[in-house]
Regions:
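C-terminal cap of thioredoxin/glutaredoxin-like
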Residues: 61-129
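Structural alpha/beta surface segment adjacent to cysteine/selenocysteine redox centers
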Residues: 1-64
Length: 129
């Protein structure tokens, strides 16, 4: 309980928006993070091509494997209020945190720029514990 991870969706296209919608279908934050991990891990499999229907099916398969029902995911994908919320959060984050690329990592409200070097990231976290 020493580190708090927060995920803030920052979709750059429709596929990423739909992936974020599926992630938010889970009400359980632990399952939410597990699903998020699977979506990132399998991103090279689903975030390809130009047919959004095929992309959505790939994302839904990942969601289904994490315990979400197809009906629940379909409802989430159609939830216009949730879509608007996610897009507004993205705009707000872009303004507040000056995000210019993804992923962007903040540690204790300070932007961390060495995100591609795991050992440096690990040391930065351990130094604060």
């Amino acid at each position: 309980n020493l580190v708090k991870f927060e995920h803030h969706g920052f979709p750059l296209d429709l596929a990423a928006l739909n992936a974020e919608l599926i992630v938010r279908c889970h009400n359980d934050s632990n399952k939410n993070f597990q699903l998020l991990g699977e979506i990132y891990k399998k991103q090279n499999n689903w975030a390809v091509g130009s047919d959004i229907n095929i992309i959505n099916e790939s994302i839904k398969n990942i969601g289904f494997d994490s315990g979400l029902s197809k009906k629940n995911m379909e409802n989430c994908l159609k939830d216009e209020e949730l879509q608007e919320q996610i897009l507004n959060e993205r705009i707000e984050a872009q303004k507040r945190y000056k995000i210019d690329s993804t992923p962007t990592i903040y540690i204790n409200e300070k932007k961390y720029d060495e995100k591609n070097e795991y050992e440096k990231f690990k040391k930065a976290i351990e130094k604060l514990l």
